[in-house]
Amino acid sequence: MARGPKKHLKRVAAPKHWMLDKLTGVFAPRPSTGPHKLRECLPLIIFLRNRLKYALTGDEVKKICMQRFIKIDGKVRTDITYPAGFMDVISIDKTGENFRLIYDTKGRFAVHRITSEEAKYKLCKVRKIFVGTKGIPHLVTHDARTIRYPDPLIKVNDTIQIDLETGKITDFIKFDTGNLCMVTGGANLGRIGVITNRERHPGSFDVVHVKDANGNSFATRLSNIFVIGKGNKPWISLPRGKGIRLTIAEERDKRLAAKQSSG
């Protein structure tokens, strides 16, 4: 009988969006326990080795991390399997680079470079609000931060802007129709659009209808919606493609047009 935590992850069972091939080895890095779920995170080793190509092997990643070059959300992280996830800011002071982990329209984490100004804050979705001991109100975010004494107007599903240096809330966006959102789960993962309406289903999942910039509409569960801007102005810079998913035919036409213009 197995007792205790699982310590391994087979390569074939690793999340698809890590984009690991089957034949390079048997195992994949199992993310440490941390603020993001195993299937929704990107371990530091994969980000540095497979995405940025700053290292060739896991040992090299360890050497980079152990020199305390890598910061996530303003804190030095030396664990190579630390689970970085959606909206996390990864800073490498040595090269002066900052990245924000955001999904592209294919549902993978894009290498999205940001300015040092933008690296000072992050957006967090409010998961739950409760009153703790001695009547102190608390708020819990999607990346497991607990913040005391939040603004009483902030409700569940709203998005808060957090200053990474102090961990304080600087601003918030209500979950409301007409606001810009990103889908963080399900079949529409990575798409960005404006919330058009919300269907309430007590006892089941609330469904939210979203319309993207090209006028395509789609629906997803409320739990997959992450508000990223007021009106249609995003509060963060968006990766290439601006979260508009093209159909296969549109992608093909775009590829051919690019080929002709370069050829």
Curated annotation (Swiss-Prot):
Q: Name one Pfam family in it.
A: RS4NT
Give the GO biological process terms.
Answer: translation
List the molecular function annotations (GO) for this entry: rRNA binding; structural constituent of ribosome
Q: Matching InterPro entries, A to Z? A: KOW (IPR005824), Rib_uL2_dom2 (IPR014722), Ribosomal_eS4 (IPR000876), Ribosomal_eS4_C (IPR032277), Ribosomal_eS4_central_region (IPR013845), Ribosomal_eS4_central_sf (IPR038237), Ribosomal_eS4_KOW (IPR041982), Ribosomal_eS4_N (IPR013843)
Q: What's any one GO cellular component for it?
A: cytosolic small ribosomal subunit
What Gene3D superfamilies does the record tag this protein with?
Answer: 2.30.30.30, 2.40.50.740, RNA-binding S4 domain (3.10.290.10)
Keywords on this record? Ribonucleoprotein, Ribosomal protein, RNA-binding, rRNA-binding
Q: Which residues form the S4 RNA-binding domain?
A: 42-104
Q: Which CDD domains match?
A: KOW_RPS4, S4
The entry sums up its family as follows: Belongs to the eukaryotic ribosomal protein eS4 family.
Query: What PANTHER family has UniProt attached to this entry?
Result: 30S/40S RIBOSOMAL PROTEIN S4 (PTHR11581), SMALL RIBOSOMAL SUBUNIT PROTEIN ES4 (PTHR11581:SF0)
Protein name (database record): Small ribosomal subunit protein eS4
Species name for this entry? Cricetulus griseus
The uppermost taxa in this organism's lineage are: Eukaryota, Metazoa, Chordata, Craniata, Vertebrata
Q: Which gene encodes it?
A: RPS4
